[in-house]
Amino acid sequence: MLYKHVAIASVNHIEAPIRLSSAEIMQRLAPTLERLGIRDNLFEDVAGITARRIWDGPVTPSDAATMAAQKAIAASGISHEAIGILVNTSVCRDYLEPSTASIVHGNLGLADTCQNFDVGNACLGFLNGMDIAARMIERGDIEYALIVNGEASNLIAERTIERLLRPESSAEDFRSEFASLTLGSGAAAMVLGRSELLPNGHPFLGSVTRAATQFSHLCRGNMDRMVTDTRTLLVEGLKLAAKTF
């Protein structure tokens, strides 16, 4: 679907304050690397990642999303009362219940008429949130929407390192949990609105989606552990990207 009446009012982000280098992680994993014969520059060589960001202390996904949302709302010039929907798209969440969106909604003091809910779809969730909100704006249901995301990778990074340092951890364990140590922390938020109300906004014309859900088992994770078939995920992901574009 192509949109004719949707524009981006603002986009903002929050960087987690602490830089955690790949070298630091590998140094902590040195006993396991030596035991399994794994080189210590694997992150840079395989993933191209030299560092990632983490929070300083106990920052929840809703905390992070709220900080980004406050910046985005201020940059947009839109009043809190004008926002008709809040969609949280974080992979991480504060709790199974209530929704992280409801916590962010309360933190921001949005109107009780503002819909709020979580949308979970891994790293594509933010785009899905944009699309859901844009359809509502296009139909005239609402005038403005707020899409947020807040991620906290501290817990999964620490738990993964702890598991890989166990004497019984194997090379297969390392390969399956390697991707968990590439994750970082941060937050982002976007305000969308009717283009007629945002003469200086950037048009949002639409999106394209394709699915290959027969491969959904290639990466499975929860808050403290993620297991990934990295090679197959890359190969099949590239095939899907080629089919899409």
Task: Please report, for each region that a protein language model flagged, where it lies by residue.
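Conserved catalytic cysteine-centered active-site region
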Residues: 40-46, 50-63, 91-144
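Acidic-glycine-rich active-site phosphate/pyrophosphate-binding loop
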Residues: 36-43, 95-109, 156-168, 215-219
